[in-house]
Each structure stands twice: as C-alpha cells, then as structure tokens.
C-alpha cells in the first residue's frame, strides 16, 4: 500500500487521539467482524479501510473475526472469499483469523451467569408471540408469562435447550431487562436460540447459538478491542452492548462507535436482494462484474488502490447519505489513467486497405505503453496493408466537427501514418465492407512535410496479426439511482447493463492477465476476464469508460 495515500481525519480518529492523549488507552485495537453469509460489497470495503486503516496508522492491531453464529446461512465459501477480499484491498489481520464460535464455551458460561443473577430467562413463547409482546415505538411491550421463572428452573431449562431436548423454535433464552423501555432493543432481547444445524467450525457440538448482540460485545471484550466500530443501524444496539458487559464478570469494556454506512447510487447493498439477483440468474454469480461485491469489482478490473481512494474521499461521518456512482468511477479512472498500460482494440471492425502499400509489407512500429511514463517501456505493433478500424471512425460525408476519417479526407492512424480515404466497397445491403485508402509514407509519427493540417487520430489493428476477442461492455446494473426504493427493485434492471461485441485486439494482448487493466485507446479501460478468457478465446471486460456517459444522458 502506497505511503502516498493520505491519512484522513474524522470524528472517530479524533476520539482515538483524545483517548491516547488522556491515557484512557495506550494502544489501539480494532476488528472487522463480517458474518460469513455472503460476499463482501463496496460498503464493507469502507469498514475494512476504516478498521484496518486505523490500526495501521496508529501502529495498533486489527482482528479479522467471523461472526459465525447462524450455521444455517453461513458457509466456508464465504469465509475464504472474505479473507481474499481483505488481502486484495491491501490489508493483513493481526494474528490468526478469529471466529465468534471460538468463544462459544465462554459465551455459554456468561449466559449461565446472567441466569444466575436473575437477568435472563428461558421463554417458550413463539417467535410471532415474542414480536407481539414486544410492543411498538409508541406502545410499551408486555411481560412474557414465562418471565418470572426461578433461577433454578431457568438453569434447568437452558440445559435442556443445550442438550437438544427442545424443538427448534419452541424455546429461547432472553435477557430480563425492561419491557417498557423506550428502546425496543432493550425489551428482553433474545440471547440464544435453538438451531439443529451443523456448524462449519464446531460441527454438531452445539444446538443453541448466541445472537449477534450477545456475541458481539463479549467477543470484543475477550479480544481486548479498544474501539468497536459499527454502522449507524447499530446505534440503539449500543445500549444492549453496554448492558451485557456491565452485567457479566469481564474486565474489559470496549466502547462502540457508529458511523454512516455507504449507500451507492445505481446499486443494491442488501445481501438479501443481492442473493436474489444471483438466485434468479439476473447476474451470473456473486462475482458478476455488474455486482457491487468486491469480487465483482475485482473481476471487472477495479484496482484495490482506487477502491481505497474512494473510501478515503467519501470519508467517515455520522450522517447517512447517498454517494454518486460517478464518484466511484472517477476514482477508478484517475487510477487507471495514471497506471494502466495502453493498447489498441477495435470493437466494431470494418476492413481498411492501404492501396499504395505492398501486399507483403509488414512494419513493426514502436509504441509507448504509457504516453507519460517512459519507465513503463514500449511495445512493437505490426503495421500492414490491411487493417481494421472502428466502423464509427469512418463516414462518407461529415461536418467539420467530425475529426475522424471521411471519404476524400485525411486522418492519422495512432502512432503510425496519415491516410486518405479514396473509395469504399459495399455489400448488397449498402453496408460498407472495405475502405480503400492511400498513406503518406513520410508521416510516421510526424506531421506532413508540406505543412498541411491533419487533426483527427484513430486507432487500428493489423488484420493479419490481430487476435479475435469478445468485449463485454458492462454498465450500471440498475437504470434508476435508488433501486432499493422501488416497489419491485428487479423492475429497475438496466437492460443495457451488458452488451457483448466481437472484434480484434493487437497481438501484444495474447498473454493478457486477468485483473491487469489496460486502456484500450479511445475506447475505455478493459481487463481479461478471469472466468472466461483464455489464450484461444480472449474475453475482455470493460472496467469503466473514458468519460461519464451517464452525466450526459441525465442532461
């Protein structure tokens, strides 16, 4: 990770600075605690950059801890993908990977302690009844008829739960707090529920599993976390976080702080809705390049540095807001414009023949891999009598604003010669099949000797040397800025989110490596697809265009 990446400031860092200055803490210890029930998305990237970035900048520690308390929804596949995503973003966790399930024995003991203090009880209301008894924001809840069981009875019943003697859903352990609390989260929340499911870490050892709010705070305390950072939807949960730690025998009491989550326009962040996109085959998987998942962004050709820069630019605040997709794409363009090697590709080819060049003539032209970075070296690209240019780069007639090839006029071929269009050949439908040109042999990368002005420049590939390729032109998956607000978010799918074209690339791209993004000159940024591209079948994903076309469309 570059040292040039500016260290941001925000209200959380100000709190940390004050804690260190006052001596409240002598070091900083954070954690990133994802649930392994899906793939991480760009919103998680913000949390990763915040937690790991703070640990890095304060020479502290950051744990990677999987909140694996629901075996029904979790899978080792997600565990491995999350580890890859964190490392791809440029971070390493402190020590071994941790799991909430590592603490199941301690959590069970703390549950027994709460029961022993009369602060937890086994409830046999159904889930629906618990919801009814909980009340609303404007009306208090009411006590469960099982709330006043004795400590001895609750201990015995909780043991029966642990031994699997209750059916799933027939009993749970609840905290005994206040059913009239103005905060619904404090109205006797569930601490443990029964699930007869094999766990990816603990197997079948347990059939009772702790809830997030009980697990999260205790895991933080056991690991010595100093600053527990969550998104704003957990703000009310902080009261329960503190209540649990205040009522058990544990020496460490971390403090929870909340920050705004990332809401990105033209995207969905809900795991449930993302899962629906996958299950309904709207996209081809969690790593589909149109998905906001980190694996999808990586496959599309986004760089880790650009994602980190995006997270830095949007900052950390306490106010929820929607971030424009253009802000993310701007970070990608800035990074790739600076670092992506250049190459030429023709996405909609039409044949071009240079009449005054010998049929067997082949010239290797030296071209820079980057126009402003000589340290990136050069490449040799063959130039021959027959070329392909993009169909949009030729017109039989055009006005003065059209700076490309026009019949009877000149244009420059990128890093090559000036050519003049002399005539065209068409098929029976009137479609141009071949453009016949002449070239000025004295104009290789220089102006014509007679001083005539040639303003336009177009890209090209040699027809006999170019490699056939498939181009996947990815765009925003949704056609509206806030698809989540729609009654049926699937109705807002952009039908043009994927357009496939077939054309040609210069031969230097034969060994294009997935996740290495190129600027295809005048076309955009592309990378070889990790799933489908091979030496015999090149497939390139468009990472992002050279400019924001959506801004124009909105005008």
Curated annotation (Swiss-Prot):
Q: Does the keyword Ligase apply?
A: yes
Q: Can you list the GO cellular component terms from the UniProt entry?
A: cytosol
GO MF terms held by the record: ATP binding; glutamine-tRNA ligase activity
Which segment of this protein is annotated as the motif 'KMSKS' region? 268-272
Where do the annotations place L-glutamine binding? Answer: 67, 212
The entry marks the following residues as binding ATP, namely 35-37, 41-47, 231, 261-262, 269-271
What gene, per UniProt, encodes this protein? glnS
Descriptive protein name: Glutamine--tRNA ligase
Short motif 'HIGH' region, span? 34-44
Q: What is its EC number?
A: 6.1.1.18
Alphabetic keyword roster? Aminoacyl-tRNA synthetase, ATP-binding, Cytoplasm, Ligase, Nucleotide-binding, Protein biosynthesis
Name the reaction it catalyses.
tRNA(Gln) + L-glutamine + ATP = L-glutaminyl-tRNA(Gln) + AMP + diphosphate
Which family is annotated? Belongs to the class-I aminoacyl-tRNA synthetase family.
Q: Which HAMAP family match?
A: Gln_tRNA_synth
* Assembly and interaction partners: Monomer.
């Amino acid at each position: 990770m570059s040292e040039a990446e500016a260290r941001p400031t925000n209200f959380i860092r100000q709190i940390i600075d004050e804690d260190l200055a006052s001596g409240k803490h002598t070091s900083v210890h954070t954690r990133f605690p994802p649930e392994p029930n899906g793939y991480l998305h760009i919103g998680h990237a913000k949390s990763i950059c915040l937690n790991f970035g703070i640990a890095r900048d304060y020479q502290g520690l950051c744990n990677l801890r999987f909140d694996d308390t629901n075996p029904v929804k979790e899978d080792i596949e997600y565990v491995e993908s999350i580890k890859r995503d964190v490392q791809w973003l440029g971070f390493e966790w402190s020590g071994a990977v941790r799991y909430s399930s590592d603490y199941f024995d301690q959590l069970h003991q703390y549950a027994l302690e709460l029961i022993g203090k009369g602060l937890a009880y086994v409830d046999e209301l159904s889930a629906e009844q618990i919801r009814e008894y909980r009340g609303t924001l404007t009306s208090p809840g009411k006590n469960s008829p099982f709330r006043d069981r004795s400590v001895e009875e609750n201990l015995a019943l909780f043991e029966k739960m642990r031994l699997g003697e209750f059916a799933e859903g027939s009993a749970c352990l609840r905290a005994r707090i206040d059913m009239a609390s103005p905060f619904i989260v404090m109205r006797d929340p569930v601490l443990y529920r029964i699930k007869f499911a094999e766990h990816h870490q603990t197997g079948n050892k347990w059939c009772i599993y702790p809830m997030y709010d009980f697990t999260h705070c205790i895991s933080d305390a056991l690991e010595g976390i100093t600053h527990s950072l969550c998104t704003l939807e957990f703000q009310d949960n902080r009261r329960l976080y503190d209540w649990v730690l205040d009522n058990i025998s544990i020496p460490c009491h971390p403090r929870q702080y909340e920050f705004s989550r990332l809401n990105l326009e033209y995207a969905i962040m809900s795991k449930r809705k993302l899962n629906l996109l996958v299950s309904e085959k709207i996209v081809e998987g969690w790593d589909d390049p149109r998905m906001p998942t980190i694996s999808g962004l990586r496959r599309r050709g986004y760089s880790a540095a650009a994602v980190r820069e995006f997270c830095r630019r949007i900052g950390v605040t306490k106010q929820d807001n929607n971030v424009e997709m253009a802000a993310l794409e701007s970070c990608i363009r800035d990074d790739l414009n600076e670092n992506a090697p250049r190459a030429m590709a023709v996405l909609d080819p039409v044949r071009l023949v240079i009449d005054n060049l010998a049929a067997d003539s082949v010239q290797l032209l030296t071209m820079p891999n980057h126009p402003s970075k000589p340290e990136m070296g050069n490449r040799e690209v063959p130039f021959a009598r027959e070329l392909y240019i993009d169909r949009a780069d030729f017109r039989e007639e055009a006005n003065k604003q059209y700076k490309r090839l026009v019949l009877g006029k000149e244009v420059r071929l990128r890093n090559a010669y000036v050519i003049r269009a002399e005539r065209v050949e068409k098929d029976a439908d009137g479609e141009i099949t071949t453009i016949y040109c002449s070239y000025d042999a004295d104009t290789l990368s220089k102006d014509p000797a007679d001083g005539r002005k040639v303003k336009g420049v177009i890209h090209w590939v040699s027809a006999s040397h170019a490699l056939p390729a498939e181009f996947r032109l990815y765009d925003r998956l949704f056609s509206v800025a806030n698809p989540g607000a729609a009654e049926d978010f699937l109705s807002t799918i952009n039908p043009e989110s994927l357009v496939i074209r077939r054309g040609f690339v210069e031969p230097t791209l034969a060994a294009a490596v997935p996740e290495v993004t190129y600027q295809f000159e005048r076309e955009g940024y592309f990378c070889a697809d990790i799933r489908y591209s091979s030496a015999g079948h090149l497939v390139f994903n468009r990472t992002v265009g050279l400019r924001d076309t959506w801004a124009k469309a909105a005008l």
